[in-house]
Each structure stands twice: as C-alpha cells, then as structure tokens.
C-alpha cells in the first residue's frame, strides 16, 4: 500500500535538497543563509533536472510493479491518518517552496524585486501546523483498517 507515494516522496525530498543547495550556492537567492556566489550553481541545477527527470521516468515506467493490492479502507483509520499527515507535510513543503521561489519567479517575469516575509509564512503555515497537531494527537488512538463511530467516540473521549 502506498509504495508509489512513498517512493515519490523520497525522490521529491532528495530533489528538493539539491534545489535548496543550488539556491544557496549559486547566488540566485539573497538571504542571510545564502553563501557567496560560486561557479558550482549550474552543476547543481543540472543535477536537479537529472534527478527529477530520472525519478519521473522510472516511477512512470515501473510504477505498475510497485503498486500493492491493498488500499486505505477508511480515512478514519490509522493508515488514513498517516496518509493525511503525509499530505499535510507535503502541503507545508509546497508553501515553503512557493514562498522561497515566488520572488525569483516574479523577478524573472516582470523584473520587479519583491520579498515574501514572515506574515506569509505565518498565515500559510499556521493552519497546516494546527491540522498536523490534531492528526498527530488522534492517529495513535485510531485502529488499523477501519473504525466505527462508536469506537472513535470511546477512544477519543476525554477521561
């Protein structure tokens, strides 16, 4: 169950670490965390493109062999909560990626220099973080496979 999803998350994580290294080492991103400009930036960008291309091709080509016969029976199960946490973490990563890359895209398209500051990240990350906290609190008490309403009420009832 979820083998293709797990492999996709693994490949995306590795590719995004290479992208982050490119952004900080190439001088494209102006930040207190960025390093001085060096000539290694294009190599990281090429490596990033290679990793993404190979990952997409291999997952597309061999994805049918990775698919397991099982599936998530209910969203109100432990595996459903874990998958929900995965989706929320992926959304959180997308919010951070968008906040990091958006000023670069605007500058490339319009030539305008903009800045995405703390209010954007606070506004976007707070609901995702609260949902993550809720799911992390509820997931351990959910049963595997399927949960009935009565069982959920009993396990989530405050003593």
Where are these regions (language model features)?
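Contiguous transmembrane helix-bundle modules in multi-pass membrane proteins
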Residues: 6, 10, 29-159
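Aromatic-anchored segments of alpha-helical transmembrane domains
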Residues: 12-22
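Internal alpha-helical transmembrane segments of multi-pass membrane proteins
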Residues: 2-3
């Amino acid at each position: 169950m979820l083998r293709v999803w797990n492999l996709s998350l693994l490949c995306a994580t590795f590719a995004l670490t290479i992208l982050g290294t490119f952004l900080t080492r190439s001088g494209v991103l102006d930040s207190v965390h960025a390093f001085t400009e060096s000539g290694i930036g294009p190599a990281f960008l090429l490596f990033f493109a290679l990793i993404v291309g190979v990952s997409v091709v291999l997952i597309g080509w061999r994805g049918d062999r990775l698919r397991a016969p099982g599936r998530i029976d209910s969203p109100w199960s432990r595996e459903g909560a874990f998958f929900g946490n995965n989706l929320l973490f992926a959304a959180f990563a997308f919010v951070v990626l968008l906040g990091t890359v958006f000023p670069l895209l605007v500058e490339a398209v319009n030539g305008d220099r903009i800045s995405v500051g703390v209010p954007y990240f606070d506004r976007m990350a707070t609901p995702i973080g609260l949902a993550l906290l809720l799911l992390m609190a509820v997931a351990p008490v959910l049963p595997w496979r399927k949960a009935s309403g009565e069982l959920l009420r009993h396990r989530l009832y405050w003593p």
